[in-house]
Structure formats: structure tokens, C-alpha cells
Amino acid sequence: MRNWFSRHPVSFMAFYLLFYLSAFHWLEVHIAVPDVLVHCHLDDLIPFCKYAIVPYFAWFVWIPFTLFYLLWKAPRADFWRLCLPLFAGMTIALACYVILPTGLDLRPYRVYGSDLFAQAVRMLYATDTPLNVCPSIHVFNSVTLMMAYYRSRIFETPGRRWMRPASAVLCVSIIASTVLLKQHSCIDVLLGILLAMVLDTAPWPHWNTATQEPCSGCEST
């Protein structure tokens, strides 16, 4: 199975996406009341900001962009060095949500305004319940992605060097958006960062290390 997935990285990502979405849907259906409401004093000092919806939604684009960029432009080992801890951390977060269901009571009572930003926040609140929050997957993924940009040597070339500081800015912006939109507590943020740092130091296996060239025929056998 491992050898097959190492030769079919796109299929590996597709299988994991299916697993993740199914697991998250199960959590949303079966865990309606959290055991713990996550909160700290710092949460009360952070104002709500509807404009933070922009970097928050950018997260959904950044993940597949980075994965496919490394898959096609970087040595295959760089792709797996991001993919394995990224998916492992998301799975650990899901397990945490099952073991200790967490939730939030931080959102504003009403989001005022008819502008695009206010409408987007209302749409987010309507579709994303304030449950299963600690650790923050948004934060974990952002930190893990940023570290991949600073690890891979392809971003040392002049034409790509700008992508490293850009990834840092985007990472910080996404993390800030989670608390500015009241989607997460600072505690969720801290544990998301900690999870990313711990998994980054783990001894990950080198999948398909014999393939050191970027992916040209990702689904070839």
C-alpha cells in the first residue's frame, strides 16, 4: 500500500481528503455539545474584525496550492516531507476532538453590514459550528506549510525567494484571522502551533526517495 501511494501521490491526497471530510462530518453530526468551552482572558481583549475573513478563506487555497506546487516543482522528498506531517497532524486534531469535544462561545451575537465581508462572515458562521476547535487545524496547517517553504531548497532560487517571506506573512495573517473572527481561542492557536512544531521534528520516513525529480506523470505506474 505504501509503495502504491508513493507512486500515486495525487490519489494519496484524494483518499486522505475523503477520510478527513468524512471524519469531520461525523464529528459535526455526533458531537453537538462540547465538554469544554475553550476561553482565556486574552480572547476578550481581541476585537472582532470582519475583514479577517480574507486571509481566513485564503487558507483553503493555500493548502492545495502548496501541495501541488511542491509535487510538480520540487524533489519528491520535499512533497512527502510536507504531506506526511500535515495529514498526521490533522488526524491527531480529529482524535483530540473525539477524546475531548471542545467548543467556543466567543462569536458576536450579530454581524452587521451588507458588504461582502459581513456576508462572508455570516455564511461562515452559518456553515461552520463553533465546535471541534482545539487544537486549531487552521493554525496547525498554516505553520506546517510555512515551515515547508523555509525547508525546501527550491525556494532559495532568485525567482522563488520571495515566496518564503510571503508564506510567513500569510501564515501570521491566517493565524490572526482565527482569533479576529472569533473562530478560535488563543489556546487553540497555541496548541496548533505546538503541534506543528512537535511534528516538524519527528523522524518522518522518506517515501519514494529514489524519485528526486519533480512530478511529471503523477499517476503513472
Residue locations for each model-derived region?
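Aromatic-anchored segments of alpha-helical transmembrane domains
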Residues: 21-26, 90-99, 169-179
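Short hydrophobic alpha-helices at membrane interfaces in multi-pass membrane enzymes
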Residues: 159-172
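C-terminal membrane module of polytopic membrane proteins
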Residues: 185, 191-221
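Membrane-interface loop-to-helix entry segments
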Residues: 47-61, 126-148, 186, 190
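Hydrophobic, membrane-inserted alpha-helices
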Residues: 62-67, 144-148, 169-177
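Interfacial helix-loop-helix junctions of multi-pass membrane proteins
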Residues: 107-111, 129-134, 173-200
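Membrane-interface loops
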Residues: 27-42, 72-158, 210-219
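N-terminal transmembrane-helix/juxtamembrane module of multi-pass inner/ER membrane proteins
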Residues: 1-65, 109-112, 221
